[in-house]
Every structure is written in C-alpha cells, then in structure tokens.
Regions:
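Mixed-charge, low-complexity intrinsically disordered regions
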Residues: 15-154, 165-174
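Sec-dependent bacterial lipoprotein signal peptides
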Residues: 1-15
Length: 174
C-alpha cells in the first residue's frame, strides 16, 4: 500500500507540461497609438514556466521573468528617415518550484537525564533562487518611410501612419 502511494506521489510530482516561453505585448494592438520623441513604441515582456524538480512546468502556473524587447522612437534623421532604438534585455534565473515555494523546516531532539536536559536543533532552508538581468543589447536603426511604412520587431508588426519631428502615430499588429 505504501509503495503504491509513493509511486503515485512521484508520478504526480513529475506531471506538468514541458516548459514554454510566453511573449506579452504591453500595448494594445489594432488601434491607433501616438508617442513622442524618446517615447516607447512597443514593449514585449517574456516569461517562461517555472520549472519543477523534474524539469517540467509548475502545476500551479508559476512564471519566471525572462526579460523584454522595447522599441523607442528617436525622431527624424537629417535625411528624413525615422530613427528607432530597440533594446533587448534577457535574464538568467536559478528559480525553481523548490526555491519559490519551499520553506524552512526545523527538527528538535531533546533528552532529559535526571534534572539536566540536552538537545539539538537542525534547520533546513530551501535553496534560494535568483534572477539577474544581463547587460542590455541596444541597436539604433533608421527606416525610409517613403519606401515602406511597416516593419517587424519581436514578432510585432509596426505600421507607421504619420511621423513628425516630435511625434509618431502608428498601429501595432500581433
């Protein structure tokens, strides 16, 4: 009986889908948006499933931050091209279900001999997980809007509707 319960617990603990990456656009798509020089055009946040002890996805839906891609409007160059800056930030994480949900456990053993007592306390702390940001990867580029008013960054299509020296009007399409 105990062996079958143990086997069931181990089988259920290994449950969970394989780890997946999720991209979330922070702006609304399919709607006209306006920004200023230096303003954010789009931001795509990336997360992955929190891994469990077996390397599968956390059954409680925990996520780990994996960074983002951001596009900013930088203005118009001397030759009339629209200038943009794309920044990619990635993270490295050692977080798992054990580090996020695990707690500390203490065990105390005491022994009474006559009128004296002695004992030991043993404490186990769950491993600590950490997520650190890697240095940003930033690239600036210019687009001739007379040739093309559309381009794609991080899987999101940017369609430029109007541009001035100080503003950009556009639509994002997923």
């Amino acid at each position: 009986m105990r062996i079958s319960i143990l086997a069931l617990v181990v089988a259920l603990a290994g449950c969970g889908a394989t780890l997946q990456t999720y991209d979330r656009l922070t702006q609304e798509s399919d709607r006209e948006i306006m920004t200023h020089v230096g303003g954010q055009v789009l931001k795509v946040k990336r997360t992955t499933d929190l891994p469990n002890a077996f390397g599968n996805a956390d059954i409680f839906g925990g996520k780990v931050d994996r960074g983002f891609t951001e596009l900013r409007f930088q203005g118009i160059a001397q030759d009339g091209r629209a200038v943009f800056r794309v920044t990619e930030i990635e993270t490295q994480s050692t977080e798992t279900t054990m580090s996020r949900y695990g707690g500390s456990k203490s065990k105390m053993d005491a022994q009474l001999i006559g009128n004296r007592m002695s004992g030991t306390v043993t404490t186990y702390d769950a491993p600590r997980g950490s997520t650190e940001m890697l240095p940003p990867n930033t690239t600036q580029f210019a687009i001739d809007l007379n040739k093309s008013k559309e381009f794609t960054v991080a899987g999101v299509k940017v369609r430029v509707l109007a541009v001035t020296e100080t503003s950009l009007t556009y639509v994002l399409q997923r």
